[in-house]
Amino acid sequence: MANRPIEPAERLSLVSEYYFSRKLKEVAQLNAEGKDIISLAIGSPDMPPSPQTVEKLCEVAHNPNAHGYQPTMGTPELREAMAAFYKRWYDVDLDPKTEIQPLIGSKEGILHVTLAFVNPGDEVLVPNPGYPTYTSLSKILGAKIVNYNLREDNGWQPDFDELEQMDLSKVKLMWTNYPNMPTGGNARRETYERLVQFAKEHSIVVVNDNPYSFILNEHPMSLLQVPGAKDCCIEFNSMSKSHNMPGWRVGMCATNAQFISWILKIKSNIDSGTFRGIQLAAAEAYRNSEQWHREANIETYSRRRKYAEQIMEVLGCTYDPNQVGMFLWGKIPEKYADVEDLTERVLHEARVFITPGFIFGSNGQRYIRISLCAKEEKIQQALDRIKALAW
C-alpha cells in the first residue's frame, strides 16, 4: 500500500501567517544581531493591573478548592461584576444570569459568534480598514467576506448610503469596532443608532468590538445604550486594554438571552472555563476607582502620545488630533510610493518598529500606526533616533 503524504486542511490555504507573527521573527533576529529595535507596533499594555487585582489572584490561588474546572458560563461573581461595570460606566442594564457571557479574551468571541450565527457560504460585513481577525476567522469558517469602506473624510464611520446600495440578502453578521482600531475614530451616538436601525431593517446581527472605549476617551460609550440594540446586536468588551490585563485573557460579550444561549452552546463544546482565581481577580478589577482609570487610561497615554505625535510630524505624516485609543494613526506623505518604503526604512535605519496600515485593509495602504504601549522614555528614544535621520 503506497504511503500517502500528510497534507494540511484546505482551510489553511485561505489565510496567511499573521503579520505580527512573521514580522516579530524578523525583529527578534535584528535584536539578536545587537540592533536594539524599539517596538511601537503591538497594542499590548505594558502597565500592571491595579494592586487589588493581583492581590485577589494570589489570595484565591492559595485556596486549595479553587483549582478545579469552572463553569463555562463563568462564575456568578464575575458576571455580576461585568453587569455592574456596564451600569456604572455606560448606564446599560444587563441581566448577569442571561445577558452576559465571559470569554477567554474577546478574540475567542469572534470565533464563537461566527460559529453560532454563520453557515458556510453566508456573507459577513467586515470593515476596511479593520482588525484582521474578523477576516481570517470568517474565511476559515467558510464565510464570504464583504468589505465595507471606512474613510478619513467620513471620520472612519460606516457610509450607510453606500451600505444600502449593496446586495445584503446573504449577509448574516456585520463587524464594527468603535472606538475604532486602527484609525482611532471615536464612537458616535448617531452611528450607533444607525447601526441598530440597519441591523433591524436587514435582519443582520451587528457585533461591536469595544475594547478601546476608555483609552484617551473622556466619554466611554456602548452600542447597547441605544434602545432595542440588544434585540439585534452583540457587544464585546475586554479587560486587556482598559485594565492592563492582556495576558489574563478575560473578555465578555453582552446581548439578549437567546443569543447568549447560542454562543454558550458553542463555547461549552470548545473550552472548560477559566481559572477561578482569574475570574475573581477580574471581578475585583472591574471595581477599580475612577482615579485608577484616569491615571492608567487617560493621563499616562496622553503623556506618551505627545511623543508619538512628534514622530508623526518628523516623518511628515498627518493625523487627526481627536482620535482616541492606544495607537496613533497617521497618513504618510505623497513622496512615498508605498507605506512599506517608509516603515522598512524606519525599522532598518532608525531601528524602530511601527505598523504599516496595509495589514488592516486596502484603505490603510497610505497610513502608519504607532503604538503607545511603551514607556515614555522609550517613545522619546524612538523619536530621537528618527530625528537623527533625514526624511
Region locations from a protein language model:
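Helix C-cap/helix->beta junction micro-motif
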Residues: 141, 201-202, 315, 350
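Conserved glycine-rich beta-strand-loop-beta hairpin in the small C-terminal domain of fold type I
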Residues: 283, 299-309, 319-331, 364
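A short helix->loop->beta-strand "cap" motif at the edges of active sites that frequently abuts
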Residues: 122, 143, 201-205, 230-231
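Active-site phosphate-binding strand-loop segment of PLP-dependent enzymes
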Residues: 146, 150-221
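Conserved PLP-anchoring active-site segment centered on the Schiff-base-forming lysine
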Residues: 116-138
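PLP-dependent enzyme catalytic core of the Aspartate aminotransferase-like
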Residues: 146, 164, 336, 345-354, ...
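Conserved core segment of the aminotransferase class I/II
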Residues: 228-299, 306-315, 389-391
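N-terminal small-domain helix-loop-helix segment of the aminotransferase-like
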Residues: 2-105, 112, 285-288, 390-391
